[in-house]
Amino acid sequence: TEKYDLKNNTESRKMPQEVSTLLTSKIYNNHYVDSVVCPSKVSVNFYNEYTEGGYYRKHVDSFKAFPKANNVFFDYGFTLCLDDEHEGGEFVLENEVGEIVYPLKRGQILIFPIIYPHSVNKVTSGSRKAIVGWMSSNVSYEQSYILKHVYQLNADAIKSLNEEMIVKSGVVQNYLIKHWST
């Protein structure tokens, strides 16, 4: 029988504390992340590197990513791209619509519900570096999905400068956040 390798990358859990603290702070203080995810816990866990030929096959993250997580269950995963010095290595997410390929660039972060299967395509040249972690949410995935659409409605209303829509969607968004996070 042929050996099946789920992944071919290098991972390190030895994340410098200052990097973890800075990234956690940036995530907590991002208005969009707060509006959509409403994070209650952010866990910055791994630095990973995919050299030429590196990949991560399709998988689903565990709700409880670590045995010593003190019964913290995670709702979202994220990957933060650290470089542009590679070809291939795209992040692939499978949702209700199908597979979506994200060729992340340096500084881009992708946050996704951990219930979605995902993978990293094979790196064809160079080295892909990223930081990955997980978040718990104060609201359920379904509630967060609704908040995302209300947030987008609010953003669209602001673009159209329709004051009545801005106020209405802001009120609904704030009500939902308050209702679901208590």
Model regions: which residues?
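Non-heme Fe(II)/2-oxoglutarate
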Residues: T1-K41, F46, E142, I146-T182
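Catalytic core of non-heme Fe(II) oxygenases with the double-stranded beta-helix
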Residues: Y32-H149
